[in-house]
Amino acid sequence: MSIISYIAFLLLIDSNLGIPIFVPSGRNISWQPVIQPFDYQCPIHGNLPNTMGLSATKLTIKSPSVFSTDKVSGWICHAAEWKTTCDYRWYGPQYITHSIHPISPTIDECRRIIQRIASGTDEDLGFPPQSCGWASVTTVSNTNYRVVPHSVHLEPYGGHWIDHEFNGGECREKVCEMKGNHSIWITEETVQHECAKHIEEVEGIMYGNVPRGDVMYANNFIIDRHHRVYRFGGSCQMKFCNKDGIKFARGDWVEKTAGTLTTIHDNVPKCVDGTLVSGHRPGLDLIDTVFNLENVVEYTLCEGTKRKINKQEKLTSVDLSYLAPRIGGFGSVFRVRNGTLERGSTTYIRIEVEGPIVDSLNGTDPRTNASRVFWDDWELDGNIYQGFNGVYKGKDGKIHIPLNMIESGIIDDELQHAFQTDIIPHPHYDDDEIREDDIFFDNTGENGNPVDAVVEWVSGWGTSLKFFGMTLVALILIFLLIRCCVACTYLMKRSKRPATESHEMRSLV
């Protein structure tokens, strides 16, 4: 599974459970105009519940990862008597017959045969030789054991092995009877050992009210070090791999351990029969990678909004949403009023909304467990009412929440409407200190004059052809010069060679 598909999978789950947003909890905010330069520390991505005012308890949780399709190895051991019968009547010839009769195997003998196979000293007795006596019927037998590798499946909910050849289809022991009563299945593994291969132990912190053993546990949640959140709301108790534990609404299961989890476990209802548990998908490394990737993307989007503000470019509601904190607690809040960007300080609380367009921003205050409206301060700006961090009330009277691309929001026409957001220049701020015009960017495919582009292309080819021609002429001249040198050297050697007299000239003397 790729990272992008995993992000989409997480967003799909979140959309089914509600969209989390962070809203200011305070009603009286002191607004001040934003001063240039806009120096703002972009918030990191959190997407985690608000932990403000809640008690924290460190604990170690044991939770199943993805159960692989690997089977549990073992052996089928079969025992039988191999008989040879000799029928030698006084009145006729000998008749030899062979037969195999299954018997119940013994565990010790099966283990001995398995060890012999592992050591490479297997024995095959086969049928014994016949033993014939006149006027008699004689039978000789060998007890033969056969073992073959055979893997079965682990069923973690019931904590047993399953195979269609088992009596009843399931077994919990290291030695299991098979159909026919003449074969047994033997393994060195145990259910606990196989389950332990898929159970991971991770540190976490449980937040919430003091666990008093009543319905207040529903507001508690656990955040582990891999940023996974386990909410106790809608949880139930069930066994998994023969261990008591708590199954959460999103499918996660954690083993009941001593302390706080035991108190909560005893007060949650039991799960209905057939309840399934989901393992962690994907692995821990990819979970951390996705979390860090979201951090980088949202930080980049926030920095883009800061650049627009300092250059006094027009902003959209989506741009302002990138400045909003991604985690509860103390932080900055922004709004546009009369064309001026203003900033204040507040405490954020996480609530969940059904979608990007809602009637009101209602939610439950975790500090009081009371439901209330968190924001009702709207400033008229043209045809819409500006709220906070890009949240506004549109022409339809409904509240529009600009969910950014990380939260997979729906961008409508009003969200894309750009508006001027002036900021007040600081008297000691020199705008010339930051000039993007001074930064050189190489040509990266931007549009230009097509005539100039063609002329540059043709002139470039002309220069290349001229260089190629000059290189070719130089190579030809060098070749001719080498040939001349070789010819001159040959002629000089020939002129120095002494003349020889023939036998005819010597005979005339």
Swiss-Prot record:
Record's keyword terms, sorted: Clathrin-mediated endocytosis of virus by host, Disulfide bond, Fusion of virus membrane with host endosomal membrane, Fusion of virus membrane with host membrane, Glycoprotein, Host membrane, Host-virus interaction, Lipoprotein, Membrane, Palmitate, Signal, Transmembrane, Transmembrane helix, Viral attachment to host cell, Viral envelope protein, Viral penetration into host cytoplasm, Virion, Virus endocytosis by host, Virus entry into host cell
Cysteines engaged in disulfide bonds, as pairs: 42-302, 77-110, 86-132, 171-176, 195-241, 236-271
Glycan attachment points: 28, 181, 338, 362, 369
PTM entry text: Glycosylated by host.
Signal peptide segment: 1-18
Residues linked to a lipid group, S-palmitoyl cysteine type: 488
Domain of life where this protein originates: Viruses
SUPFAM superfamilies: Viral glycoprotein ectodomain-like
Residue ranges, Virion surface side: 19-461
Record field: transmembrane: 462-482
InterPro entries: Rhabdo_glycop_CD, Rhabdo_glycop_FD
Pfam families per the UniProt record, alphabetical: Rhabdo_glycop_CD, Rhabdo_glycop_FD
Motif basolateral targeting ex vivo: chain residues: 496-505
Topology relative to the membrane: Single-pass type I membrane protein
Biological function: Attaches the virus to host receptors, inducing clathrin-dependent endocytosis of the virion.
Protein name: Glycoprotein
